[in-house]
């Protein structure tokens, strides 16, 4: 778990995470969220399917698909003194309807602490919708792969940089290179463009 695939865009990261999860041994567990509208919204009450289809920034997906052994990342600060901060990486050890048991990714080969995570209530932004709503879900997302930006501040033994297209922001490549502790732990996956050039 002291390794990751880094990519410049969320779209690439989501596809990579899904591909790695499918290859991981074990049975997938689907964990749906509980979504609800806060207060009355009159006659324009959204249907549950609409809420389930939404994935605003800062809110977990409606359906979280995990396996034991999956690498996940916290999406919210839960308890900073215990290392449970937004961006912390963990390995799923057991999956329950209301509790995930995970182990923090250790540093320098040392095993991390085992923690239990509960579902939390997340609130929609008042500016994005004509009504307020909440989603109760585990505050994690898959993290076999992550965006280069999200990897800032982390140090890993092995990093694969996946570049299906050029980086779009100045300094992104430097950030990706500097995540690995030693140059021998760095790998690249470059995809040729339509003309066959890298």
Q: How should each PLM-predicted stretch be described?
A:
Residues 1-198:
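RecA-like helicase/translocase P-loop NTPase motor core
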């Amino acid at each position: 778990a002291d390794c990751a695939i880094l990519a410049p865009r969320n779209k690439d990261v989501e596809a990579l995470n899904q591909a790695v999860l499918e290859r991981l041994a074990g049975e997938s567990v689907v964990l749906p969220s509980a979504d609800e509208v806060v207060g009355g919204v009159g006659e324009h009450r959204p249907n549950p399917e609409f809420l389930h289809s939404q994935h605003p920034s800062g809110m977990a997906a409606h359906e979280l698909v995990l396996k034991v052994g999956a690498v996940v990342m916290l999406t919210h600060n839960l308890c900073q003194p215990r290392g449970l901060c937004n961006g912390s990486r963990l390995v799923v050890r057991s999956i329950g309807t209301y509790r995930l048991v995970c182990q923090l990714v250790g540093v320098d080969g040392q095993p991390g602490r085992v923690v239990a995570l509960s579902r939390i209530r997340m609130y929609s932004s008042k500016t994005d919708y004509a009504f307020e709503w909440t989603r109760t879900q585990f505050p994690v997302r898959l993290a076999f792969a992550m965006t280069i930006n999200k990897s800032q501040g982390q140090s890993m033994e092995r990093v694969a940089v996946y570049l299906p297209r050029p980086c779009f922001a100045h300094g992104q490549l430097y950030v990706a290179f500097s995540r690995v502790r030693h140059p021998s732990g760095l790998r690249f996956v470059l995809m040729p463009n339509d003309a066959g050039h890298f």
